[in-house]
Design a protein with these regions (language model features):
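Basic nucleic-acid-binding interfaces
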Residues: 1-136
């Protein structure tokens, strides 16, 4: 776990997220060519906005899995907004034919799934905190 720690001026952290979001109406538009471009875009967005993408994959042509690490100053909602907003706009610019398969000019569903990923379980944290008062 210690090798995953990120050191900032005022804190040390290890904040990881597994995110999943899908194409509007679950349309299967994420072809190999679109996926390759999207993977590049996601890396560029992450670098520009200050977080790290460790793993990115498209599933079944209609949804995306992304594993990221981020500093505490970046909320998960901001990260998702950057990834979905910027990638959606740029994919429409690069592949205008995608727009024909969707309505209202939106590529991604409004919702998303996110889960914190860590090396310490909830049970370990509870046990550690419960034993703090017994140390004195």
């Amino acid at each position: 776990m210690k090798e995953n720690l990120i050191h900032y001026r005022t804190c040390v952290c290890n904040i990881n997220y597994h995110m999943v979001w899908s194409v509007k109406y679950r349309r299967k538009i994420l072809s190999a060519e679109v996926e390759a471009y999207l993977q590049e875009l996601v890396q560029e967005i992450a670098e520009d906005k200050g977080f790290t993408v460790h793993l990115f994959e498209c599933g079944e042509g209609d949804h995306v899995h992304c594993f990221v690490s981020a500093p505490p100053k970046l909320s998960i909602t901001a990260i998702v907004k950057y990834l979905k907003g910027i990638s959606g706009r740029k994919l429409f610019e690069r592949f205008p034919e995608i727009r024909n398969q969707l309505w209202k000019g939106e590529l991604w569903n409004h919702s998303y799934y996110v889960e914190m990923v860590g090396a310490v379980s909830e049970e370990d944290i509870r046990r550690y905190i419960e034993h703090q008062s017994k140390a004195y």
